[in-house]
Amino acid sequence: MEQEDQQYEEDSSQFNKNNYVPDDNSGEKEQPATTTEITTTTTTTTPTAIDNNDSDLTEDVINAVSKYKDGTSSKSVKKTRRKFAMNIATDEVFNLPPMEQQQQQQHLQPPLSPNSASNTNFGAAATFSPTSILSKNNKIITSQQTSSTSISPLKPSPLSFSSGILPPSSRIYESPPTLGKYDKVILVILSQQYLQNQVNIFPIKLIDRERINLIHQNILSNEFQLLKSLKHSGIVNYIGMINDNTGFGIVQEFYENGSLSDIYNRSGAFQESLVAKYTLQILEALGYIHSQGIVHRNLKSNNVLLAKGGKVKISDFAIGIRSSAIEPSIRFSLNGYPFWTSPEVLSMKPFNHKVDSWSIGCLIMELIVGHPPFSHLGPMEALIEIINPSTTILPNCLDENEQSLFSLELNQFLELCFKKEPSDRASVHDLLRHPWLSMFNDSSSSSSSSSSQAHPTVQSNNLNGNVNSRTHGEFYSLDFLSQFEQNEKEISKILSSGDQLDSTSNQIDLKKFQFKHYNKKQQQQYNYNYNNYNNNNNNNNNTNDNDNECGEQTEEINLSSLSKDEQIERLKAIIDQNETMANNLKYTMQEVLQEQTKYYEICESMKSKTLEILNQNKTGARISAHSNSLLKRTNQMANDLGRKYEILQSNIKRLEDYLITKDDCAKKLANVVYRNKISFDSLLNPTLAANLLYQIGSKTWKKGQEKRAFATLKDNFLFFFKNEKSSYPIDVIYLNDKRNISITSIQDSKKKAYIICIGTTIHDQNNLDPSNNNESVNLSTSPGSLVNSNSNPSISNSLNNNNNNNNNNNNNNNGNPNVIITTNNNCNSNSNGNNIATPPISIPNGKEVKEGKEIKEIKEPKEKDKDKEKDKDKEKDKDKEKDKDKEKEKDKDKENNNNNNSNNNNNNGNNYNSSETIWCLLAFDNSKNMENWYGVLDSVVPWYDKRAYEISKPMLPIENKKHQKQKSLDSTNKQSPGSLGGAGGDVSWKKESGGIKFQGVVGVRLDDLMTRESPTAELPYFLSKMLKFLEKNVDEEGILRLSGSSTEILEMKQQLQRGESIDYTYKDPHAVTGLLKLFLRELPESILPEHLRIQSTEILSNGRFGEKEKIKEIQTLLSNLSRPHYNVLKHMLFFAKLVVDRSEYNKMVIANVTTCFSPTLRIPPGLFNFLINTYDLSFPKFNLSV
């Protein structure tokens, strides 16, 4: 084990030097294989493709190898751990300096004659053919690793890899006899006598018979027959199998470019686009393999070969490839190192075809960064990490530099491959549909197939002649510009290759070939012919120079002066030299022939590229026409969507402006709110949204009828959701009157529950007609009062009936005896039913209308009330009088509510309710939660009057409640605090005040207030003075939650209304806070308009925006505010931020601040919370729009 670890560390160090070759079945570092050649010699011509069905060829190959194997034992050859290995001649060998290149060629050149060492130097342009190393007697030559090498018949070019075999310089390690590995690989080169002037090379992989038992031999035979039956363009073609007394031999196709691992070691990392192209081809081949019930189980870069035209071929399947019916000892066996193996195989668990999906991920990582996962660990450590379910492959196996090489789509693709559980891992068909493959294969898939078919095959070692067509359909790319640039690059490469060929002269220079002659006459005749040749090709000025050159390069030989033995030796030397020259001339002619063949290839590639561009233009024309139709359709759909959006906005506006008369209308509004998918965070702080029990309907809690829901608050709406994930509310309650909110508690046998009772008053539309505010009938009904009338829904219509149209009434009045109806005319009310409470109707003449046409003046009750008021004014102070008025009103509200409940039980079907109250009960387990919710609900309900088209109580009762303590200026029209109109006389008060509620600062527009201040002031003076006082007392406990004395708040309000300056030094901070909230609630206009509120909610709920983008959008939104509104919002948020900073930061502090000021300023809670947290960034110094 220590030796293996030491060897692996050595392999890893060599990998860092870019000498790493991914291992084969064993998973170890690979070295060049022992290469044995079986050759026969002949003059090579242009080879052609071999028919796949040529059985004679297979027999010749097998017979040739059998002859070799009979004479040579496989034991004498060193074993290697790779199935197939060969060294490829790179451009670096042929780009050496002239001297080194000449030395390299001399090293590779075989001896041409016995005394070749004494021969003259040859030209540097001469190249050599592999036929020089072939035996002339057609004998089989065995070439060991250090004995002989062969030269490529083609000079390597930048466009393709050659099949040259160079002498290996690496060591060969002994490998243990492991099943699934080959002892050696031999190359069979067949020539004329087999293939009719064609040279083809076939690799044969040999396995020693002593290493495998009889069971394994049968398995190998059966599986080879299965592999031989596979016919696919992405799988290596297996030709035959040799089985004799020495062992097994497998004959397959030969590919001169080698494996992807060899290419990585030669050229470096692959580009992602090229990896995607190869991955697509491999997945298509694996899809075919899996459809045949076969699992590869040994997929890695060393087992993927590259053919001409960029086509990859899968080879070297692991033993036990069948999905079933395999012996367990083989099926669950481990092949080599675990770096490429899936967790289920390493755990020896049952596996399926998804083990190849794991190997695909390892292969992609290997092609891009040069190593599989966990290659920096030892084998056992890597096995543990792969099996460990908590360990992730990405990005643990990559450093920071390597992670930058992987795109986002590729990372997603690899995550699907590296799922530890096979059920979660993507199959081959799932990976084929991944967008990462379509990114790089859309535009190149169709072109690559056409170009590969159009290229002529100069030397084809691919026996699979018919290339199967792509299983995928034709892909089209709309990126015409990238196609155009790619075509230009390819054409420039082809033309540059053509220029290089043109620069190489195809004519043979005879001056390089020096032949010796026998006598002087022949030499002179040769000189004469040679001079004529030069005169025809050169200028006349160079004639003498050429003669001198020729004279210097030749020598006169006089054989008569020598002895006979010397003449014989001299003639032998001349013959040897002339033979050498003849060989050089032959090689030069072969090189010229090869250059012409390459030129022919370039012409054919130009032709195929022209056809490809033509097809691209046709496709582009079709796509352009289709794009135009799609563009028209898209524009039409955009216009339709625009119109629908405008209709939707108008409907939303109509729904907002519509008078809501029933609770189902409130649900419609909730639907509009949640149609924009507003989250809970933008609705309200999460601390104000909780699970609770509620009931709707009765004002009393009924056991067993409660519902559990998730409640949250939005403006004046209380939404109930089934759970936190629900997107549509199940119930909606509208809060429109603070008098309808009360608290109570109930006690049962188990525990005590705290109840909040909320009443929503819904009125008839005719009673809220704003056009008849001055002369309409005023209703002083309580929240639960019911008005019973005839079939006429409007009480005003019943009061305007003619006096002569009197009907008989059968009424049983069990209601309040103090109900007063006053009218100016002799109007009779018509009713059929049991009237329990009739709303009082005020008429100036002070007469009472009774049933049965009897009209009497009511003097005694009024006189008694006036006397009581006078006595009370004399005995008690004004403050006590106000308190008693409040108590009386509360008692009347309770009586009216009781009367309304009894009236609801006694109503007939013919009676119409002009107003009704919907009750909602919220139940809490403890008083603290109840108090928190009660405070929030109390702050949400507005104190100001609603407009006529909003859900609201009638205007008069609310004004009475708000201004009943204000004395009327009309002394002749005094009324009791409990009577209609209150102490203030609302009608006369409105006339004298001109319709303005407050004459001072409360209830006045901010723009009007700022006109009274200096131009440089940001806030009104009284407001800035109030905020400075509160900032000094911000540490006061409960400054936002607790409310000060209502009497003190009212006194400070009256001082402000009179224009007096208030000294807040000795004032209660809680009362000053209440005054501040009162001022903000009474503002006639909202600080943030409705459309800006909607925009802010959409910005904050948009998940695509980051923090900076949201701040930028909010700044743009706030810039639309006027200067007074912007300053008020800025200073109020600064004060709220100061409260949060001075307190111990927690969710409850910011929740209290939000619930205090967000409803008061009428700003969405989510926006308020966001502005507090980002105050410094949201309020920079910039010019605001006026």
UniProtKB/Swiss-Prot annotation:
Q: Which InterPro entries match?
A: Kinase-like_dom_sf, Prot_kinase_dom, Rho_GTPase_activation_prot, RhoGAP_dom, STE20/SPS1-PAK
Organism of this sequence: Dictyostelium discoideum
Enumerate the UniProt keywords alphabetically.
Answer: ATP-binding, Coiled coil, GTPase activation, Nucleotide-binding
Q: Which GO terms describe its cellular component?
A: cytoplasm
In this chain, composition skew of type Low complexity spans 34-48, 99-110, 530-545, 785-836, 897-911
Q: Which GO terms describe its biological process?
A: intracellular signal transduction
The entry marks the following residues as binding ATP, namely L179, G180, K181, Y182, D183, K184, V185, I186, L187, K205
| Sequence ranges of Polar residues compositional bias | 453-468, 766-784, 969-978
Protein name, per record:
Probable inactive serine/threonine-protein kinase DDB_G0293184
Question: Where is the organism placed in the taxonomic lineage, from the top?
Answer: Eukaryota, Amoebozoa, Evosea, Eumycetozoa, Dictyostelia
Please report which protein family the annotation says this sequence is part of: Belongs to the protein kinase superfamily. STE Ser/Thr protein kinase family.
